[in-house]
């Protein structure tokens, strides 16, 4: 299984979306709820309810990029039973990765942020991305984190029993 972001066109609108793909094809789509700055010029806010999907023994929810800024979104996925939140991103704020550590800790689940690196040149300026893709454990611990620049592949063992133990 994998999760990837993509621009989606549906019913005459465009969405910033992510898809969960399994052996038999697309299993689920999530449309970003919280649009960032000028995204509203191109995309509509998501109109699909938050959901959790089975991936083997794990229950996985999805957020996209700026959704990190809204704790209730991660909490809603936790209340739906998520063990893991997958978070494909183009993060530009340097504190976003730390906020995802907090989301993991608040909700006792794992977060997996796949973030863009490098700089995009646009009319009127450039946008530097923060890199530092990461996998965070349910106690807010960094299981693995990439550097700010360059491509990489990462993996970490996740104990689902710990993700499901909500006792403090």
Residue ranges, per PLM feature:
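A short, polar/charged loop-to-alpha-helix boundary motif
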Residues: 32-45, 150-167
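CN hydrolase (nitrilase-like) catalytic-core segments centered on the catalytic cysteine
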Residues: 1-3, 68-155
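Short, intrinsically disordered/low-complexity patches at protein termini
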Residues: 51-53, 110, 120, 166-167
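Glycine-rich, aromatic-flanked loop segments that form ligand/cofactor-binding clefts
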Residues: 7-10, 118
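Short helix-loop capping/hinge motifs at secondary-structure junctions, enriched
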Residues: 25-28, 141-143, 163-165
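Short beta-strand element of the conserved SAM-dependent methyltransferase core
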Residues: 20, 53, 135-136, 156-158
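Active-site catalytic loop in hydrolytic enzyme cores
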Residues: 9-80, 89, 95-98, 102
């Amino acid at each position: 299984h994998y999760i990837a972001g993509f621009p989606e066109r549906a019913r005459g609108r465009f969405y910033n979306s992510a898809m969960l793909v399994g052996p038999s094809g697309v299993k689920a789509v999530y449309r970003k709820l919280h649009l960032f700055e000028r995204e509203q010029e191109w995309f509509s806010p998501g109109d699909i309810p938050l959901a959790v999907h089975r991936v083997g023994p794990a229950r996985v929810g999805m957020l996209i990029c700026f959704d990190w800024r809204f704790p209730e979104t991660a909490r809603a996925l936790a209340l739906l039973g998520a063990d893991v939140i997958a978070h494909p991103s183009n993060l530009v704020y340097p504190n976003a990765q730390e906020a995802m550590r907090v989301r993991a800790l608040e909700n006792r689940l794992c977060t997996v942020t796949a973030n863009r690196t490098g700089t995009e040149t646009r009319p009127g300026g450039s946008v530097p991305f923060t890199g530092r893709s990461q996998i965070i454990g349910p106690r807010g611990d960094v299981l693995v984190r990439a550097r700010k620049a360059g491509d990489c592949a990462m993996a970490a063992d996740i104990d689902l029993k710990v993700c499901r133990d909500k006792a403090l």
